[in-house]
UniProtKB/Swiss-Prot annotation:
Part of the outer membrane protein assembly complex, which is involved in assembly and insertion of beta-barrel proteins into the outer membrane. NCBIfam families: OM_YaeT. The lineage of its organism: Bacteria, Pseudomonadati, Pseudomonadota, Gammaproteobacteria, Pasteurellales. The gene is bamA. It is found in: Cell outer membrane. One of its GO terms (biological process) is protein insertion into membrane. Residues 1-19 form the signal peptide. GO terms for cellular component: Bam protein complex. Keywords: Cell outer membrane, Membrane, Repeat, Signal, Transmembrane, Transmembrane beta strand. Residues 22-89, 90-170, 173-259, 262-341, 344-418 form the POTRA domain. This is Outer membrane protein assembly factor BamA. Belongs to the BamA family. The keyword Transmembrane applies. Part of the Bam complex.
Length: 797
C-alpha cells in the first residue's frame, strides 16, 4: 500500500487504497468514450476476471499519466469492479495563424508541427506557451520588440480544441544613437562607416530599423576593419543595447580595445606539407612584408594553401596561423602551421535534390572522377558547370567521410532545381492584325536529360508561324552538342492600308554542332536552308536596289538559300540564370554557300560582363555590348529581309520593338504613269546593314524580397544605347532626288544614337521568365516610336 501512495504523490493523482488484492469481474473506464476508451482498455496490464494487486493499480496510474494524454488519472475499487477515471487532454482539431507577414505562415506551421502541434496531436498548453514565447523572442531578435504572440485555445465538443496563434508584429525599433568608446586611433565616423545600421536622422523618411542579426554582422565588419589595418589584437570588449520605455528606439554603445598597430615582419610555413613544400612556399609571395598587417591577406594565403593541397588529394587539410608579436617594434611574424592530413580517394559522386534532372545528366558536368584522387579544383569546377546549366537555383557541394575508412570520401552535390520550362498562351488584338493567338512551350531540361525542346506558334489575320527547336548538349561523351530548328511562316498583309503591304512564305531548317575546346571556350559550325517567296509588295527604294542586283522580273521574289554558320563562344559566368560574376562573349558569322540564290554574309560580336560589388553578390555592375554587320557579295546586295533593327527588350528599352533603323522610301505614281518616283518617306523601318548596342546596369537587391529569394528575381537600373545605320548609304542615296534627300537624315552615320534609362525587373515565375521594364528616352529623334513600359514572357534582358 505504501508503493501505491508514493505513485499517487508522484503523478499528482489520487486513488483508493485497496485493503487486499481482489478479482476484478469487470473494468470500467470513466471520463472518455469511443476510440480513446478502447485504447486505454487495450493498454491496461490486467483484464476482467484477473486478480488485481497494489502494483497493478500503481502501474495503471503511472503508464496512463506518463503518456502525456491526461491531466488526471485515478483508479479505485467499487465492489468487484476496477474503475479507471481519467481527465483527458484536448486533441488538436485545427491550427490557425493570423497577423503575421514577416515570418511566413508555412514556416510557422512547420515549426508548430515539429513541436507537436499538428492536427491530431494532444494539446499541451505549457508547450504552446513556450512556443509563443520563442516566436516573440525571434521577433525581438529582428528589432520588433513590441511584437505580441498570443496563443488562443478554443475548446470544442468531444474533447477537441482549436488553436489560434494571434500575432501583432508591430514595427521595428529605430537606431536612435550609436556611440563608440575606447577608439583612440580610429575615429568613430570611420567605424560607423563599416556598419549597415546607421542612426535615425530627420532627413531619412523611414529612419533606420534596428535588427539584431544585422548588428552582429556590423560588429564583425568593425573587427575586420581593425584586423585588416594592422590592429591584430583589437577586440570589441562590450556592447550595450538599451531600449527606451516604449521599445521604439535603441541606443547602442560599443566598447573597443584597439591595441597596437603592427607591420608584418615575416611569414613561414611549417608542418605536414604532404611533400608539397616546393608548391606551397611560393604562395607566401602574396604577403606584403614590412607593410601594415592585414588579416585578409593571411586568410587568402591560408585558402590558397588548402586549395593547392586539395588539388593533390588532401581534402581535409588544416592551416592555422600563429602570430609572434614584437610590441617594442610594433611588428609581428606569422607562422602558418599546416597539417595536410591523409590523401583522399573519391569513392562515389552523389547528387541530392534533383527530382527532375537525372543523375546521368548531372554526371555529364562532372570533372572529378570516381575511384581517383580527390581534387578540390575539379570538384569546384563541377559546381560551376552545374550552375552554368541554368537548371538550378542553388548548387552546393560537400565531402562525406566513409564509415570504416579514413582515406575515402563521397563527394555530394546538393541542388535546388528551378522551373526550366515556360508555357505561354495568349490572345491579343491589333488594329491592323486583328485577333491574334499565340502559344509556346519551352523546356530547357526536357525529362531531366538536359536537352532543350521548344515549339512556338502564332496565328492572326495576317498569317501563321510555327517554329520547332531541339538541342542535345550531350550528343557525344566528349561534350559535343547537336541542335536544330524547323520553321514555317506564312505572312500576308496585302489587305492592309499601309504602304508596307506584301505577302511572304518562308520555311526552312538548320542544324548546328558545338565542340568544346576547354572549360570556358567552344566553337560551333552549322548548315541551314531557307526558302523565301515574296510577292505583292509595294515598290520601295532599298527593296528595288536588291531586286535590281538579283535581276528579278515581275512583282515576285523566290529564293532558295543554303548557309554555313560558324562561331566561337566564351563563358566564365558563375550561373546560367541570373549570373553575378564572369564574362560571356561570342563571335559568329553566317554566309551563303554555292547553290544559293542570294550571296551575303552576316557577322556578329557580343560580350557581357558581371562584376559584384559586395561579398554576397547582391550589388552587381553589368555591362553589355553587341555589334553586327551584314553585306552582299558577288555584285548582289543584302536581302532587305536580312537587315538589322533595334528597339524593345533585348536591344533598346523605351523604344518600340524594331522601330529603330533607316526608314522606307516608297514610290509615288502620278499622271497615270506606270513608273514611280521614290519620294514618299514612310515611318516604316526598312533597317540597316550595321548595328551597335550597349547597356550598363546596376543590379540591386529587390525590395521586400528575402536574401534567399534574391536569385529568383532581379531588379536593375540601366542605361541603354543603340544605333542602326547603312554603310552603303553614300552610294545608295545617289538614286534619290535632291528634294527627297533634304527631307532625309543621313542613314550612313553611326552617330545617330538613341539612348534610354530606366528600371527593369525579372522574375523566374512558375509559368516561365517574366521581364518588365520602364524606360525614358534620353536621346531620341523626331517621330521615334517611344514605348516606355514593356514586358516579355519567356525572355531576359
Amino acid at each position: 500500500m505504501k508503493k501505491l501512495l508514493i505513485a499517487s504523490l508522484l503523478f499528482g493523482t489520487t486513488t483508493t487504497v485497496f485493503a487486499a488484492p481482489f478479482v476484478a469481474k469487470d473494468i470500467r473506464v470513466d471520463g472518455v468514450q469511443g476510440d480513446l476508451e478502447q485504447q486505454i482498455r487495450a493498454s491496461l496490464p490486467v483484464r476482467a476476471g484477473q486478480r488485481v494487486t497494489d502494483n497493478d493499480v500503481a502501474n495503471i496510474v503511472r503508464s496512463l499519466f506518463v503518456s502525456g494524454r491526461f491531466d488526471d488519472v485515478k483508479a479505485h475499487q467499487e465492489g468487484d469492479v476496477l474503475v479507471v477515471s481519467v481527465v483527458a487532454k484536448s486533441i488538436i482539431s485545427d491550427v490557425k495563424i493570423k497577423g503575421n507577414s514577416v515570418i511566413p505562415t508555412e514556416a510557422l506551421k512547420q515549426n508548430l508541427d515539429a513541436n507537436g502541434f499538428k492536427v491530431g496531436d494532444v494539446l499541451i498548453r505549457e508547450k504552446l506557451n513556450e512556443f509563443a514565447k520563442s516566436v516573440k523572442e525571434h521577433y525581438a531578435s529582428v528589432g520588433r520588440y513590441n511584437a505580441t504572440v498570443e496563443p488562443i485555445v478554443n475548446t470544442l465538443p468531444n474533447n477537441r480544441a482549436e488553436i489560434l496563434i494571434q500575432i501583432n508584429e508591430d514595427d521595428k525599433a529605430k537606431l536612435a544613437s550609436l556611440t563608440f568608446k575606447g577608439n583612440e586611433s580610429v575615429s568613430s565616423s570611420t567605424l560607423q562607416e563599416q556598419m549597415e545600421l546607421q542612426p535615425d536622422s530627420w532627413w531619412k523618411l523611414w529612419g533606420n530599423k534596428f535588427e539584431g542579426a544585422q548588428f552582429e554582422k556590423d560588429l564583425q565588419s568593425i573587427r575586420d576593419y581593425y584586423l585588416n589595418n594592422g590592429y591584430a589584437k583589437a577586440q570589441i570588449t562590450k556592447t550595450d543595447v538599451q531600449l527606451n520605455d516604449e521599445k521604439t528606439k535603441v541606443n547602442v554603445t560599443i566598447d573597443v580595445n584597439e591595441g597596437l598597430q603592427y607591420d608584418l615582419r615575416s611569414a613561414r610555413i611549417i608542418g605536414n606539407l604532404g611533400g608539397m613544400s616546393a608548391e606551397l612556399e611560393p604562395l607566401l609571395s602574396a604577403l606584403h612584408l614590412n607593410d601594415t598587417f592585414r588579416r585578409s591577406d593571411i586568410a587568402d594565403v591560408e585558402n590558397a594553401i588548402k586549395a593547392k593541397l586539395g588539388e593533390r588529394g588532401y581534402g581535409s587539410a588544416t592551416v592555422n596561423s600563429v602570430p609572434d608579436f614584437d610590441d617594442a617594434n610594433k611588428t609581428l611574424a606569422i607562422t602558418l602551421v599546416v597539417d595536410a592530413g591523409r590523401r583522399l580517394t573519391v569513392r562515389q559522386l552523389r547528387f541530392e535534390g534533383n527530382t527532375v534532372s537525372a543523375d546521368s545528366t548531372l554526371r555529364q558536368e562532372m570533372r572529378q572522377q570516381e575511384g581517383t584522387w580527390y581534387n578540390s579544383q575539379l570538384v569546384e569546377l563541377g559546381k560551376i558547370r552545374l550552375d552554368r546549366t541554368g537548371f538550378f537555383e542553388t548548387v552546393e557541394n560537400r565531402i562525406d567521410p566513409i564509415n570504416g575508412s579514413n582515406d575515402e570520401v563521397d563527394v555530394v552535390y546538393k541542388v535546388k532545381e528551378r522551373n526550366t520550362g515556360s508555357i505561354n498562351f495568349g490572345i491579343g488584338y491589333g488594329t491592323e492584325s486583328g485577333i491574334s493567338y499565340q502559344a509556346s512551350v519551352k523546356q530547357d531540361n526536357f525529362l531531366g536529360t538536359g536537352a532543350a525542346v521548344s515549339i512556338a506558334g502564332t496565328k492572326n489575320d495576317y498569317g501563321t508561324s510555327v517554329n520547332l527547336g531541339y538541342t542535345e548538349p550531350y550528343f557525344t561523351k566528349d561534350g559535343v552538342s547537336l541542335g536544330g530548328n524547323v520553321f514555317f511562316e506564312n505572312y500576308d498583309n496585302s489587305k492592309s492600308d499601309t504602304s508596307s503591304n506584301y505577302k511572304r512564305t518562308t520555311y526552312g531548317s538548320n542544324v548546328t554542332l558545338g565542340f568544346p575546346v576547354n572549360e570556358n571556350n567552344s566553337y560551333y559550325v552549322g548548315l541551314g536552308h531557307t526558302y523565301n517567296k515574296i510577292s505583292n509588295f509595294a515598290l520601295e527604294y532599298n527593296r528595288n536596289l536588291y531586286i535590281q542586283s538579283m535581276k528579278f522580273k515581275g512583282n515576285g521574289i523566290k529564293t532558295n538559300d543554303f548557309d554555313f554558320s560558324f562561331g566561337w563562344n566564351y563563358n566564365s559566368l558563375n550561373r546560367g540564370y541570373f549570373p553575378t560574376k564572369g564574362v560571356k562573349a561570342s563571335l559568329g558569322g553566317r554566309v551563303t554557300i554555292p547553290g544559293s540564290d542570294n550571296k551575303y554574309y552576316k557577322l556578329s560580336a557580343d560580350v557581357q560582363g558581371f562584376y559584384p560589388l559586395d561579398r554576397d553578390h547582391l550589388w552587381v555592375v553589368s555591362a553589355k555590348a553587341s555589334a553586327g554587320y551584314a553585306n552582299g557579295f558577288g555584285n548582289k546586295r543584302l536581302p532587305f529581309y536580312q537587315t538589322y533593327t533595334a528597339g524593345g527588350i533585348g536591344s533598346l528599352r523605351g523604344f518600340a520593338y524594331g522601330s529603330i533603323g533607316p526608314n522606307a522610301i516608297y514610290a509615288e505614281y502620278g499622271n497615270g504613269s506606270g513608273t514611280g518616283t521614290f519620294k514618299k518617306i514612310s515611318s516604316d523601318v526598312i533597317g540597316g546593314n550595321a548595328i551597335a548596342t550597349a547597356s550598363a546596369e546596376l543590379i540591386v537587391p529587390t525590395p521586400f524580397v528575402s536574401d534567399k529569394s534574391q536569385n529568383t528575381v532581379r531588379t536593375s537600373l540601366f542605361v541603354d544605347a543603340a544605333s542602326v545605320w547603312n554603310t552603303k548609304w553614300k552610294s545608295d542615296k545617289n538614286g534619290l532626288e535632291s528634294d527627297v534627300l533634304k527631307r532625309l537624315p543621313d542613314y550612313g552615320k553611326s552617330s545617330r544614337i538613341r539612348a534610354s534609362t530606366g528600371v527593369g525587373f525579372q522574375w523566374q515565375s512558375p509559368i516561365g521568365p517574366l521581364v518588365f521594364s520602364y524606360a525614358k528616352p534620353i536621346k531620341k529623334y523626331e517621330n521615334d516610336d517611344v514605348e516606355q513600359f514593356q514586358f516579355s514572357i519567356g525572355g531576359s534582358f
